[in-house]
Design a protein with these regions (language model features):
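Basic polyanion-binding and macromolecular-assembly surfaces
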Residues: 2-300
Length: 300
């Protein structure tokens, strides 16, 4: 549910807190689509960003993070640090969520559902990127290597997964949100001062997301509202397991975040264009790599 928090940073009220990165995808029919990284499923590691003309800048930020310096990534896409990010298609950098949120349903009737990863845009319509390559790869069987969806360039389906639930008079819904300071402490810069500034900045963003009023709309037919008879409880849980009550208002969180952002220095907002040639090369390289492994196995 933390993914529902991230889009609040598109709100004008929080414009000073984060840079905005938008990617333009040109279509074969002459039109263009603009994708905000805040809306991309894999954030700054999403295929629409990784195969844009910001690719080198993103690669460098991940390489720096791999070496233990997350400042470059925070300048580029701080919400990728707050809500977690996995650069699975290149550097392998995996950053845990600092803010996570779950909604648990107790004493309910379980259902199943089919799920899908939807690519940030329809890459088959991208100028200079032929639909045939994507269609051929997606038409392959489950065992076929180098599918376009593996690179985030096409949709991916998953059937019969655990899904929705039906509630009755004995059911209960519990929303739990966690802001992990231990995950925050894993972030560092190239000096003690840079580390302190980085952590304060990311903590500020996390607190803003953590305390912001949430839209009651969960999905069609499901509106979630607090139970006035069971007010929310806030606790600080220390390493030794002791707990103390804690409260913070959204206004206080925002004031802290603004001060921390000014001290850290928010990165510049950027615009970029999807690069179909880079995406085609990545598809070809992935297919060649898999074919080589397959040939090696057959030769044994």
């Amino acid at each position: 549910q933390a993914n529902r928090m991230e889009p609040i940073f598109k709100n004008d009220r929080y414009a000073e807190l984060v840079p905005r990165i938008t990617i333009t995808v040109k279509k074969n029919d002459g039109t263009a689509e603009t994708v905000d990284v805040l809306d991309a499923g894999h954030r700054i590691a999403d295929g629409v960003a990784r195969f844009s003309d910001l690719s080198e800048k993103i690669e460098d930020a991940f390489q720096q993070a791999k070496k233990g310096n997350a400042v470059h990534l925070a300048k580029l896409s701080p919400t990728s640090l707050v809500f977690g990010c996995w650069d699975s298609r290149s550097t392998g950098v995996k950053l845990p969520r600092i803010v996570r949120s779950t909604i648990r349903a107790l004493d309910v009737n379980k259902l199943t559902r089919s799920a899908a990863y939807m690519a940030a845009t329809n890459f088959q319509e991208a100028e200079g990127f032929g639909a045939q390559e994507v269609q051929e790869l997606e038409a392959a069987s489950e065992k076929k290597e180098a599918k376009a969806s593996t690179l985030g360039l096409a949709n991916a389906l998953a059937n019969q997964n655990p899904g929705g639930v039906l509630l009755d008079e004995n059911s209960e819904l519990l929303r739990e949100a966690v802001l992990s300071l231990s995950a925050l402490r894993r972030l560092a810069g190239d000096s003690e001062e840079a580390t302190a500034s980085l952590r304060a900045y990311i903590l500020g963003l996390a607190l803003v997301a953590f305390t912001a009023p949430q839209d009651t709309f969960l999905r069609m037919g499901c509106e979630l509202t607090p139970d006035p008879e069971k007010p929310a409880t806030w606790e600080v849980v220390r390493n030794d397991g002791t707990r103390t009550d804690f409260t913070v208002t959204h206004d206080d969180a925002l004031a802290f975040a603004l001060e921390a952002a000014r001290d850290f220095g928010v990165g510049e907002s950027l615009t970029a264009t999807f690069d179909p040639a880079a995406a085609k090369k990545a598809l070809k390289d992935a297919k060649d790599k898999k074919d080589k492994k397959k040939a090696t196995r057959k030769g044994k």
